Amino acid sequence: MRPDGPRDPVVGPDSGPEPPYPVRLSGPVIKGFGRGSKELGIPTANIPAEELAEHPDLQVGVYYGVVALDPAKFQYHGDASRKGEDSQAAILPAVLSIGYNPFYKNKTRSIEIHIMPPLSSPSPTAEVTTQGQGHGQVKFHKLPDFYGTQLKLLILGYIRPEFDYVSLEALVEDIRVDCEVARASLQRPAYERYLAGGQGLDAVEKQRRWLVSF
């Protein structure tokens, strides 16, 4: 079960990713368990877990990083500052889980990626909206379906281990906090450069070139 107590608002060293990060993963977006959007209201892009064989020390848990989708099949139009750049893949922030999701007791390991809006956009998970009868609702960022599109992922840091939960609502709330922790962690200069570029750092630009090369 998830331990009681507040969560750290930021994770990872301020100086930037440390080994083994960044970790590269890629693959076509495939159908997952069908729960992300339907039950949880959290759209996820799943990619095949076979590539994890190249990273045997990568533990199960929740991570943050950046992603890009093949622009030949999917173009992101949610950032007005990118007008005229449709031929270039957009690099977007992401939070992801690698593991078995103890709440659902999955038998096979999966990679489930939730793509967030640009850091310049308002965060949809910053607060919980109150519905009728006092129930709270979380709105997560949603994109049109892009099954079959090639996705590239750079994992930049680790957030937390997997937990089981007493309720679906508790699981959703922890994922909401994961999104906020990921955003805050990526907003630091040493991480934001993987999204924005323009820092003149060869190591970062090399990773960015890999992300957008399809």
From Swiss-Prot:
Residues 1-26 are annotated as: Disordered. It comes from Aspergillus clavatus (strain ATCC 1007 / CBS 513.65 / DSM 816 / NCTC 3887 / NRRL 1 / QM 1276 / 107). It catalyses: riboflavin + ATP = FMN + ADP + H(+). Keywords: ATP-binding, Flavoprotein, FMN, Kinase, Magnesium, Metal-binding, Nucleotide-binding, Transferase, Zinc. InterPro entries: Riboflavin_kinase, Riboflavin_kinase_bac/euk, Riboflavin_kinase_dom_sf. The gene is fmn1. The lineage of its organism: Eukaryota, Fungi, Dikarya, Ascomycota, Pezizomycotina. This is Riboflavin kinase. Coiled coil: none annotated. One of its GO terms (biological process) is FMN biosynthetic process. Pfam families: Flavokinase. Catalyzes the phosphorylation of riboflavin (vitamin B2) to form flavin mononucleotide (FMN) coenzyme.
